[in-house]
């Protein structure tokens, strides 16, 4: 996936990180898994959103990418 395929909010933050206005996190995969896990565990969110977050987190964990 390319940045231009992402929503406006993602593209805006990408630009801010690239310009130094927003902090860069070197362990991006760990950050993503933690965030997806938090979303999956949040019972105030719709089950469909939680399921999607859990699926994405599980796929990242099983992938061969490492921080």
UniProtKB/Swiss-Prot annotation:
Disulfide bonds: none
InterPro entries found in the cross-reference section: UPF0253
Pfam family, one: UPF0253
Superkingdom assignment: Bacteria
Similarity comment: Belongs to the UPF0253 family.
Protein name: UPF0253 protein VS_2370
Organism: Vibrio atlanticus (strain LGP32)
């Amino acid at each position: 996936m390319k940045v231009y395929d992402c929503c406006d909010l993602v593209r805006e933050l990408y630009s801010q990180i690239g310009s130094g206005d927003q902090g860069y996190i070197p362990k991006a995969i760990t950050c993503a898994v933690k965030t997806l896990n938090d979303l999956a565990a949040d019972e105030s969110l719709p089950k469909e959103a939680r399921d999607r977050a859990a699926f994405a987190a599980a796929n990242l964990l099983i992938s061969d990418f490492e921080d």
